[in-house]
């Protein structure tokens, strides 16, 4: 009898199937503007890879790859410009111009976090990294945070903040 009971319990445990249900957890909060009160969820791996590839492609001077990942016009906001500027695709000339003062650029990414605001049709990926700009034997080091806006797997806006590294 003990053997039959043990066999029955073992069979019951083996035949049980664990059911896993994934739930998107919302967090954070929008505090200002038309989206006040809306929360965020973690964005997609696809958007994460696009943003990281874009950041690396710029440092490597692969402007054709950057053009493939962007919409017809990308709005770029960098603090020294004062306001967002529209960059028309292909952007090779614009990108070459802003890289022209430097012999080369390297970037070391610290982290990248994809987010999607509840109810929105786009995701943002915040990428923070160290950028080294080499020029005539000297190195200019910057801490940079890019917030890259992605809709339908295409970048349509980049907001950038930077500061110097001591």
Question: Language-model features: where?
Answer:
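Sec-dependent N-terminal signal peptides
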Residues: 4-13
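A mature extracytoplasmic/lumenal domain signature
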Residues: 70, 80, 129-131, 146, ...
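A solvent-exposed, acidic/Ser-Thr-rich amphipathic alpha-helical stretch
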Residues: 63-115
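Short beta-strand edge/turn micro-motifs at domain boundaries
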Residues: 19-23, 141-166
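A short hydrophobic beta-strand element
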Residues: 121-131
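Positively charged n-region of N-terminal signal peptides that target proteins for export
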Residues: 1-4, 17
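Short, cysteine-centered beta-strand-loop-beta hairpins and adjacent loop/turn segments enriched
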Residues: 83, 132-141
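Short, low-complexity N-terminal intrinsically disordered segments enriched in polar/charged residues
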Residues: 16-60, 68
């Amino acid at each position: 009898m003990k053997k039959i009971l043990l066999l029955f319990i073992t069979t019951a445990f083996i035949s049980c199937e664990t059911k896993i249900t994934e739930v998107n957890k919302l967090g954070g909060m929008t505090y200002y503007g038309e989206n006040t009160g809306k929360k965020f969820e973690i964005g997609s791996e696809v958007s994460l890879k696009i943003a990281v590839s874009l950041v690396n492609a710029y440092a490597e001077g692969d402007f054709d790859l950057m053009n493939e990942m962007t919409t017809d016009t990308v709005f770029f906001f960098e603090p020294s410009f004062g306001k967002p500027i529209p960059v028309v695709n292909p952007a090779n000339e614009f990108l070459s111009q802003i890289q022209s003062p430097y012999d080369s650029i390297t970037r070391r990414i610290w982290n990248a976090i994809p987010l999607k605001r509840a109810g929105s049709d786009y995701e943002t990926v915040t990428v923070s990294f160290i950028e080294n700009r080499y020029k005539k034997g000297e190195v200019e080091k910057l801490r940079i945070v890019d917030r890259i806006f992605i809709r339908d797997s295409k970048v349509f806006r980049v907001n950038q903040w930077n500061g110097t590294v001591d």
